[in-house]
């Protein structure tokens, strides 16, 4: 059969990437904007712990999607996807003018509008993992990697936008100790205004979410209507060591077909796809849950404690470069995909090595090793980049291996992602918000001197 035009193939990959970009860009945008809004909102630096809880509660979106599937079995997958996209667009659109609104709750001021809308966005983002991923079962594995590339952009673009905004600009004013004489000392930190406001930041996020929704509509025009749920495979098939070469050939062949024909080829039930709870499948899903528990729950909760002792610059470099490692890992997976379970677990141990180093720095905050040195800055930033890159590659490789099981496998992958993220967030809430396990420093104050 004749190969499709290259332009059509590239367009489909682009639309899938833009579609994936809208999955978590709202919550990621709120996270990177915290250094700006926290200066205005009454919760202060406890705001990240509030947001962690709200994102964990956002897993209720999983229950809402499950309820919808029970009440409307066999219905088109586009409806929950469009609802999720609509909630994200409306939520960020309302954040732009309302984020700074406060109200009295139990006699104390709270940022009710910001927290409420953050919860709505958390619901939509968490639901995206069990609505967006099953839709991709109608496409071959290379398009799934384009989707994860888009998810990487959902973390990278807000960080780039935040740097353009000027997040983290801080200077310490030196003044004489006694009038006009005496040695200079550091006093209150000076925060310079950003290049544009938080409201403008949220408007840009709204535009990006609108672009993602438009990309999904474009995919619906390119692809035929997906088959009803009853005709989908009911099991999870993962390749065995003896069929790796055949699997690679089967995976490569759909790229030579138009997206419409690919959908009908990939979505047909596989008579061998019946081992949903095989040991290999369980290992892959467990690995997916562990990596997401670390990257979405455990490590983000301590990122400020591990980085801020080395300065605002180290913190923002770790955020931006660590986020950029995500799409780079997706590019690597598109070229070289690890199909060995032992290899993936080996990579997981490598990622845990970097994660352990970062957790150690957070526990020793505000006086970790090499504080105040360039070597300390390089090590903490490099550790965040490598940790994020390794775990991102594991996520893409694991999901690609699960793809052969069709929609049920990708649905199970989405559940594993959210369950892991939920457990990680719950585990880190007491030590970061209740018990003084991690201690923060003060700007322009040397707490590590003799």
Curated annotation (Swiss-Prot):
Q: Where is the composition biased (Acidic residues)?
A: 242-252
Q: What GO terms describe the biological role, i.e. biological process, of this protein?
A: flavin adenine dinucleotide biosynthetic process; riboflavin metabolic process; riboflavin transport
Pfam families registered for this protein in UniProt: SLC52_ribofla_tr
Record's bilayer topology term: Multi-pass membrane protein
Gene Ontology cellular component terms for the protein in this record:
plasma membrane
Q: What does the UniProt record note about how this protein's activity is regulated?
A: Riboflavin transport is Na(+)-independent but moderately pH-sensitive. Activity is strongly inhibited by riboflavin analogs, such as lumiflavin. Weakly inhibited by flavin adenine dinucleotide (FAD) and flavin mononucleotide (FMN).
Q: Does the keyword Cell membrane apply?
A: yes
Gene Ontology MF term list: 4-hydroxybutyrate receptor activity; riboflavin transmembrane transporter activity
Q: Which InterPro entries match?
A: Riboflavin_transptr (IPR009357)
Residues that span the membrane, as ranges: 14-34, 47-67, 79-99, 114-136, 147-167, 201-221, 282-302, 317-337, 344-364, 371-391, 409-429
The protein's role, per its UniProt record? Plasma membrane transporter mediating the uptake by cells of the water soluble vitamin B2/riboflavin that plays a key role in biochemical oxidation-reduction reactions of the carbohydrate, lipid, and amino acid metabolism. May also act as a receptor for 4-hydroxybutyrate.
Protein name according to UniProt: Solute carrier family 52, riboflavin transporter, member 2
